[in-house]
């Protein structure tokens, strides 16, 4: 049994959600996907260093509950964790923003996506960091995950 069959079984059992790459060609959309468990408890069984993966998985679950199949990821020369084109929303998941290179990586990706597709709202979801920054005319909210989930995205 190949891995794709396992993925399909997990999807049919409502244990896994899959996001398409918004930037990929039509033929790639079926093969190049990012997969997330619908429950962080399931993911926790399979990983050793859970912090970042659990945060990203929680963001995927939260966005999928609100926007359904309108949630994508973006990966073409830049990587943005979540993109909701109908809402003009881009979300990055980053456990800590204390490292300058991590901050720069997340911000550059949002600015680059905004230059391709004008965004109405950009958010970096973190474990505990909070603030607002502006880069190249783009307002970027940095929000702790608990506040982001409670406010309904």
Predicted regions and their residues:
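Hydrophobic/aromatic beta-strand patches that form the interior of the parallel beta-sheet core
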Residues: 36, 91, 123-125, 141-143
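Short active-site-adjacent structural elements
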Residues: 80-81, 99-102, 131-135
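Short, charged, amphipathic alpha-helix that recurs within catalytic cores of restriction-modification
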Residues: 103-116
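Domain-level recognition of nuclease-like catalytic cores that cleave nucleotide substrates
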Residues: 128-153
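Accessory nucleic acid-recognition modules appended to NTPase machines
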Residues: 1-90
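Active-site ExK catalytic segment of metal-dependent nucleases
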Residues: 85-99, 106
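Conserved phosphate-coordination/catalytic loops
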Residues: 53-54, 101-104
């Amino acid at each position: 049994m190949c891995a794709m069959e396992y993925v399909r079984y997990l999807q049919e059992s409502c244990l896994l959600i899959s996001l398409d790459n918004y930037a990929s060609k039509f033929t790639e959309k079926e093969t190049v996907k990012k997969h997330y468990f619908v429950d962080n408890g399931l993911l926790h069984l399979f990983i050793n260093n859970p912090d970042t993966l659990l945060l990203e998985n929680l963001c995927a679950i939260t966005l999928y509950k609100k926007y359904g199949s309108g949630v994508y990821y973006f990966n073409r020369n830049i990587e943005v964790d979540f993109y909701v084109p109908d809402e003009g929303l881009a979300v990055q998941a980053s456990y800590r923003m204390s490292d300058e290179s991590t901050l720069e990586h997340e911000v550059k990706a949002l600015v680059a996506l905004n230059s391709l597709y004008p965004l109405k709202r950009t958010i970096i979801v973190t474990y505990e960091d909070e603030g607002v920054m502006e880069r190249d005319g783009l307002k970027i909210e940095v929000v702790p995950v608990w506040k982001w989930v409670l406010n309904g995205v």
